[in-house]
Amino acid sequence: MTLIKSITSINFKKSNSNSPSMINLNSNYYNNNNNKFQFDNTISEGFDILISNRSPQLRWWIRWWDSYSQ
């Protein structure tokens, strides 16, 4: 198990694409009311996660992604 202390941005690279798309803490995907990122299936499905520039707001999301991707 790898401990991820914090994250500020997430890179998604679609499996059949060379061009990644970046989603960061300041994007519209972040819902400040419940402190959760919101991704629909067209964004999250079939994407690989690459992690950089860490921050604690995303800890819960990484736990979610770990369970989603297995």
Swiss-Prot record:
Source species, domain of life: Eukaryota
Protein name as annotated: Putative uncharacterized protein DDB_G0287145
